[in-house]
């Protein structure tokens, strides 16, 4: 159970949940930490066990039922007629929290050899929250939750290339309608779209190469106040993912694949603000607490499209910091006789951008009509701050995949 004092403005409440402060001062600059934060970060959580076991790798791996999150264009090359999967991710268990969970349901249907449609439902439960006032009196109790519902269409444009388009509705209710002083709160809502592409070709009789790109969550800013304020609203996690994967068939029974993903948020980087101190003749600090002159970087309060473009060149430390904003995933998958899989991977995020570093491993077993997958996350950040205190440490994912076409054919 968690307690939150509901006595400040909603912006502060938003920061309690997600750390969504978009300004830094000299103290932050000295520490070097300049993370990019957004609303509804649950959209960035890897929902399935296969990709979760490969270091969050997925934009160019072979198509599967969970391709929606990683690259909807891959559905055009999927072999089975129809499929569905359900995944469950217990979240932040390393913090001793037992009631935060992600549930994920996805499915697809091949209209013909060229076209495929797909859908997904993502539900994030943040557990029980008790709201208190300045006197610690309980003023309410609520279970914050978020969800996203999406549909996608994928089509082959050639024997080697496909594109995908997806639309998504996002709903985030963190406060249950509680008010912060005179500021009323509402559930945040947004509409977003994904645009993706996938290319695959044979390098030899036993080796293939695939390349993928996905720009996801292109949509309106999200606000939790009754009166929408463009400057006070938060970006949703508009994201660019690019990667490749090489598949090698060793013989009739053994197959391996290895790939790399690069990932970058397409939202503004927080600038550095001047922390100006003014002392009067009596030695009293009369500084203006609202002084917000930008001394490095760019104004993050811009429109969505401007923010996407600006995200490539707005970092306070220039190109060096822009490159630090790229996360890397690398993963390896081994299949034996298309029935048993072993997977491992590594994820890297620069320390100044969050410092997530972890190894992953997992396994999968496929039967005639269903497949069971599991993944496990191991903390790899051994810095003094992160070692032994990574909230993602020991995260497990569970996925159950159904080949509905085989079920119909076999009469199950």
Model regions: which residues?
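Subset of outer-membrane beta-barrel
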Residues: 20-412
